[in-house]
Amino acid sequence: MEEDLLGICGFDSSKKYRLEELAKYQSGSCIEFEDDDEMAVDYPCPFCSDDYDLVELCHHIDEEHQLDANNGICPVCSRRVKMHMVDHITTQHRDVFKRLYKDESYSAFSPGTRKYLQSLIDEPLSTNHTSKSVLDPLLSFIYNPPSPKKSKLVQPDSSSEASMEDNSLIRDSTEKDWESPSPLSDTELLEKAKKREFVQGLISSAIFDHIYNF
């Protein structure tokens, strides 16, 4: 029974300590940190139920809540922000990162955490994440332009092809009919003249015979 009471008291005192430290961050009264434990304040993620220190929280939001990070309650100042949460924290609560960078506990961070913290400190005060989110659709459009619509190839109907061939044949035969005859040779002209004289002789003979008999 006594152990249960001690456990409850210990949990309440730890929770009270965390709330007091969080209040120091939010009020700005904590200017200098005398103990390393004062830096170990966990903040609740505004988009899930997990707790992180401030550097881990920013990294967690960048990795897990990139699409939801443009609107939420800041865990540091408890204000609703309508910009990228990491941009808000790095601009409005930049002094916390600088203290972390100067504190001795910085050496205890992993290389990846130190690199990420350095990038947050070196990042300009402009809304870097917001500009990236605006440029992403534009870059996507530039590097992936919409494919041009392919025109449909109309297959000619077999009946239309047959009618076109018939018209072509008729046109060719008509042109041949209207073509001027080729000039006759001298032999052909002579034979044609003889035939004409022979026919004329027959006609003349028939006429004379008719007159004579009459």
UniProtKB/Swiss-Prot annotation:
Pfam families: Di19_C, zf-Di19. Expressed in seedlings, roots, leaves, stems, flowers and siliques. Residues 148-185 are annotated as: Disordered. This is Protein DEHYDRATION-INDUCED 19 homolog 5. Belongs to the Di19 family. InterPro entries: DI19, Di19_C, Di19_Zn-bd. Induction: Not induced by abscisic acid. Phosphorylated in vitro by CPK3 or CPK11. It is found in: Nucleus. PANTHER family: PROTEIN DEHYDRATION-INDUCED 19, PROTEIN DEHYDRATION-INDUCED 19 HOMOLOG 5. GO terms for cellular component: nucleus. The lineage of its organism: Eukaryota, Viridiplantae, Streptophyta, Embryophyta, Tracheophyta. Residues 156-166 have a biased composition (Polar residues). Its main location: nucleus. The modification Phosphoserine is found at residue 110. It comes from Arabidopsis thaliana. Keywords: Nucleus, Phosphoprotein. Residues 168-179 have a biased composition (Basic and acidic residues). The keyword Phosphoprotein applies.
